[in-house]
């Protein structure tokens, strides 16, 4: 190689390059002028152009104005002419507006606002250079401005809570789930690079999971996951950008991991062994409950168990039924056990799950047997046929009563033939066989005929019953007879011994059923149903066995026919039917007597209306005075009647339901009422030895009668109301009227305390009333009205009469009633005492003792200035006393001195006090006593009016001592006065405590006056041995309004409101 030449060539090349770089190329262009024909050369020099300056990058989230201008554009045309620069694009004339601006003269581009890379990663600016005419001097230029990213966005997980699941005992590094998180910063940048980390685990015993830092995959750390220990885990995972750097942003999310169950627990029984006892031949649906324990998830196939027999149940005597809800197995006995064959059984059972065992424990499973000891108890079993079927052969040569064989039941307890059973034929086709009831020997009833052979088709099948009456058990054995041979006789040759004409008694005894026929062409075919035979008695139905088998029995004709007598009766019946229309035409029940059509209307208020009495027949006549008498002696043969009833102890006090029954040889009563209030109900009995008439009372205890006691009581109460209203609505001619307002109902003259009494003292109307008041009072009180009042004050006795016990039959004799005693009537018409200026001695009113029906008309007393004492004597033994008015009043300011006493009516019966008026003048003595009847019965006090004045000082006592009173009525008590300073005391109605008292009626007590203060207590007691009831009533200062009394029925106590 010639190195010298090489050096020369290299040197020349280097010189050429240097010359090229440092030299300036010039191009001359010839300019030919065609006009003058001259040529001019111009030299052109090539220079480098500057049109654009590259734009600087912008950072997001910062103020980039310090970098302005971020770009500058320039055109070479600006040297020859003015150039205008303009820009357009996103951030300029497109949203977002106004981010970039340009200097149109210099071409500098500036940024004016903060940009966001997540909104606009970069900007493209279109630049133009325009001349003065707006034409483009250069081609449009694209200027790209990139926005630099900053870490301003944290990672975001796609789910708040991630759910995952994994089976327990899973291998290590098994994928559970994968987390997903994103970052809005620039991709493939450190700002968007996320790193995952588990920061918390619950339960926090030991870490069980790991996570991939880059991908977010969660995997198992080991294979120790156990659902029975922890069925669920909760993880908290954190994701941080900038690859988990300290300056990165982070976010957290939860992960819930469920541990799935696998069959990794071997089930076992609750008990290690079981002992049970069962009777032989018994079937049990619930012999024993076997509980299985499994720790796997409940109600899953891993938890459900199956108990099976390992050994001991070779005969399939037992079954085990599992309950899938409780995992409990029930041991059942499905086949009877025999004590003689097996006294004890050893069952070996095992348990497993429905699902297969998990591979982690399949090598550890070992079958464990649980022993079940079954003890069989011996019972008396009775008999059974062994074998259950026997076959015999019968040929045509066997005659009647030929022994076919024997079929004997075997006693299961002893294994020998039973001796305490009886045998009967069950299903016995053709009634062919007979069995001995004691020995079980089977014989032919009759010789087998050809007809029977043909119907049986050469083979007989029947049943034999073995009945044990002591055990009430029945067993059945089957008999099969093969009919072999030839030469079977016909029915005529067998001597009429076919089944159709056999002995009916045998047929009933042996339970015939089957098919039979005779030579009679008339047959009836039907189905006969049999009833089974229980263990206590044999079946007496002659047809038993299969109810669907057909029985053919002969139907024999008779000579019954329709004779002439029957034809005649039939014709006569048709003739009678033909007369019916004619009789209807002739009957005038459908029209008026004059021949008019239509039915006659029933007249109103005729005898066909409903009667007011409660018994059939005509209106009963009132029977007064019929005495109820009990016969003291009875015939010794009657056991249904009481021995005696004292005739003085029977007392009736009812108005409702009276009946008299004449039984023609015996009397009957259904109710009695004793004087002391005890009622006795007697069952209706008949005495055959005595005759007479008794009275029956339909009382509350005996409601068998036609009358309703509630209705009758309501009726009489309404009557009492009507009488009370009528009495109160009358003109004020029989009572004392008090008026508070002048001019309303008061006299027109001068008003004084006694100015209007004169009109009220006219008692002439009492002359015409008579005993009406007494009867009205008796009706209101519910007492019986006697035609002849008893003047004996001791009647009724308190406790001497015997009580008729319930459900007894007192007898009445036929003697006439005993006439009662008659008393005299004393009438005191009027006694008036006028006071003068002198001294007047007290004048007593004579007290008639021992009289009955006493009527005190009027007592009027006035006193002078010396104030003498006035004394009214009491009627000590008066009966049926009527006190209409008692008026005590001084004249023109006269005063009463001493004791003002109104006599008592002790011992009086049926006392009526209509008014008691005390109207003193200026003063009254210190004590004012209104005595009260203590031993009276049926007392009626309608009004008590007291008008004291200011001079009355002391105690005012109106305390009736009605300890033995009956049917007491107090309608009104009015206490009033003008100008009173004070009246203090106690007003009471007592002594009606409940021994012998009945029917009390009390009304209000009014008091008025200036400064009047009056307090009292009214005490009311129940009657008829009932408990005492107390009613408190305080009398204060109130307006003396006129109280209207209404009688109210409250059990046996009457009171007014």
Curated annotation (Swiss-Prot):
SMART domains: CA (SM00112)
Domain Cadherin: 50-157, 158-269, 270-389, 386-493
GO MF: calcium ion binding
Positions of the propeptide removed during maturation: 24-49
Membrane spanning stretches: 565-585
Cytoplasmic face of the membrane: 586-1057
Record-linked PROSITE patterns: CADHERIN_1, CADHERIN_2
Alphabetized Gene3D superfamilies for the sequence: Cadherins, TCF3-CBD (Catenin binding domain)
InterPro entries in alphabetical order: Cadherin-domain_protein, Cadherin-like_dom, Cadherin-like_sf, Cadherin_CS, Cadherin_Y-type_LIR, Catenin-bd_sf, Desmosomal_cadherin
Taxonomic path: Eukaryota, Metazoa, Chordata, Craniata, Vertebrata
Signal peptide boundaries: 1-23
Glycosylation sites: 110, 180
Domain notes: Three calcium ions are usually bound at the interface of each cadherin domain and rigidify the connections, imparting a strong curvature to the full-length ectodomain.
Name used for this protein in its record: Desmoglein-1-alpha
Biased composition (Polar residues): 510-525
Residues in compartment: Extracellular: 50-564
GO cellular component, one term: plasma membrane
Function as written in the Swiss-Prot or TrEMBL entry: Component of intercellular desmosome junctions. Involved in the interaction of plaque proteins and intermediate filaments mediating cell-cell adhesion.
Localization: Cell membrane; Cell junction, Desmosome; Cytoplasm; Nucleus
GO biological process, any: homophilic cell adhesion via plasma membrane adhesion molecules
Record text on subunit structure and interactions: Binds to JUP/plakoglobin. Interacts with PKP2. Interacts with DSC3; there is evidence to suggest that the interaction promotes cell-cell adhesion of keratinocytes.
Desmoglein repeat repeat residue numbers: 832-858, 859-888, 889-918, 919-946, 947-975
Tissues and organs where the protein is expressed, per its UniProt entry: Expressed in testis.
